[in-house]
A protein has these predicted regions:
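Short helices/loops that flank or line small-molecule/ion binding pockets
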Residues: 74-87, 103-104, 151-152, 171-176, ...
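Glycine-centered hinge/linker elements that transmit conformational signals in sensory
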Residues: 170, 213-242
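Short, solvent-exposed loop/beta-turn-alpha elements that line the ligand-binding surface or hinge
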Residues: 108-121, 183-190, 204-225, 274-285, ...
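Extracytoplasmic/periplasmic solute-binding protein
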Residues: 134, 143, 167-215
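Conserved N-terminal structural module of periplasmic/extracytoplasmic solute-binding proteins
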Residues: 4, 10-12, 27-97, 242, ...
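A structural signal for short loop-to-beta-strand junctions that line the ligand-binding cleft
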Residues: 79, 87-89, 117-152, 181, ...
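Hinge/lid segment of periplasmic solute-binding proteins
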Residues: 95-142, 158, 167, 196, ...
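C-terminal lobe and pocket-closing loops
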Residues: 266-282, 293-384, 414-418
Length: 418
């Protein structure tokens, strides 16, 4: 069951390029049939706030709608949806955070709701597990290259396409006195730091686990190449690089202090927003697919989709109201009003400049974030055990040993390893 689930969800993730090219569909209207309570749990960034606000506009005297947008959503969702009735009726998920909800039976099939209220949805938005629709995808995401066009021009450099190029270009930019610290990345110990490793490792083409098993397989040449590259980049970063998460990166970028960074596509729009971004930096901000690594040919970044699910432990009335509100939240009208907030997977969306990087990842063959049920245990182990390495306190061999020890312990406790 879990392996089928993994393959099916991954297939949904890698269809992002096709989703973006999807055709038209009927426009949604905010006219919820019936009554109910809609309680949304999501991550906290611009695109999801747009969706939540649009969904909330459907509130009436008989339909109450609330939303909790928080970076802690992944930690909250399991316990909150386990309660009966569930604390939230809607969980906005990505292709990693849906897995525990599926494994624990905390979200419901959506086929009946799609048939009744989903006229505006495209077929490829329907994330199916074992033939049942379990989530509705509405945006593609991924970390990709942000670069300063003016700095490259002054240095006489082309847009880099590999991490090796980025390191060489950073040296040129520093030697020319254009910037002291031309690089930045999400190296804050925790989820962000682990994602940096996962992205680069995906670019090597190597497997995270032994074939058909939960045994860890990153202690290899590819794993060392990734760590070597991560460490090499810190030589061109501000000394406080350990404090940078994704949100902090945008602040550093807007201040004009960085020439290259790997950042989320969902945050690209903010860097060129004429209403809020530094005009000089915004005018010189460019986007491209994530770089390759170690002679690889595919962008070294995970491909993601974001979508919504409906809780199992709620009334059918609340489920129907929640589905209708969320369909309005991701409607073509919402997307038309906020075209640069995300790489939308919605009918009628025309990709703008902020979508270039995510589309480049998808068309370049970037792989979906791994969907094995034990991948979360590896991500957690990387989150904790790479901190000393990225700080320069231990070598790659020790870091890989530490990650394996932490992962093996968790995988045994979870029943994945003996």
């Amino acid at each position: 069951m879990k392996m089928n689930l993994t393959k099916t969800v991954a297939a949904g993730a890698v269809s992002i390029a096709a989703l973006i090219a999807g055709g038209g569909a009927a426009f949604a209207e905010c006219a919820i049939q019936g009554a109910g309570s809609v309680r949304i749990l999501s991550n906290d960034f611009e695109a999801l706030r747009v969706v939540n606000d649009a969904a909330a506009s459907c509130a009436t005297d008989t339909v109450a709608i609330t939303a909790n947008a928080t970076a802690e959503h992944k930690n909250i969702q399991g316990p909150a949806l386990t309660a009966n009735p569930a604390e939230y009726t809607v969980a906005v998920v990505a292709n990693n955070s849906i897995v525990p909800l599926l494994n624990d039976g905390l979200i419901r099939p959506l086929d009946d709701l799609v048939a009744q209220y989903g006229a505006s949805l495209q077929p490829n938005q329907l994330i199916k597990i074992d033939g049942k629709v379990m989530a509705i995808a509405f945006m593609g995401n991924g970390q990709h290259l942000f670069y300063r066009k003016d700095i490259l021009e002054k240095a006489g450099l082309d847009v880099p396409t590999s991490y090796e190029d980025i390191l060489a270009d950073a040296q040129v930019i520093k030697d020319m006195g254009l910037m002291e610290y031309p690089l930045a990345a999400s190296n804050k110990p925790g989820w962000d730091l682990a994602a940096e490793f996962v992205n680069m490792y995906l670019g090597t083409g190597a497997e995270f686990f032994a074939a058909g098993a939960a045994d860890l397989a990153i202690d290899n040449e590819s794993g060392r190449k990734v760590l070597e590259t991560m460490r090499a980049m810190t030589a061109f970063m501000n000394p406080d690089y350990l404090t940078y998460d994704a949100n902090e990166l945008n602040k550093v970028w807007d201040a004009g202090n960085v020439a290259f960074m790997q950042q989320w596509g969902s945050l690209a729009g903010a860097t060129i927003d004429p209403a809020t971004a530094n005009p000089e930096v915004a005018a010189n901000t460019g986007f491209a697919a994530a770089p390759t690594i170690g002679g690889g040919t595919t962008p070294a970044a995970a491909l993601w989709w974001d979508g919504f699910t409906i809780a199992q432990n709620i009334s059918d009335e609340d489920a129907a109201a929640s589905f209708q509100a969320m369909v309005h939240g991701i409607s073509p009208e919402t997307v038309a009003a906020h075209p640069d907030a995300a790489t939308w997977l919605v009918a009628g969306y025309t990709p703008g400049p902020a979508a270039v990087g995510v589309i480049g990842n998808a068309t370049g063959g970037a792989k979906a974030y791994p969907m094995q049920p034990y991948m979360g245990l590896l991500h957690t182990a990387l989150s904790a055990e790479l901190a000393d390495f990225i700080a320069g306190k231990e070598d790659a061999d020790q870091a890989l040993k530490d990650v394996k020890a932490a992962y093996d312990t968790a995988a045994k406790e979870g029943g994945f390893l003996k």
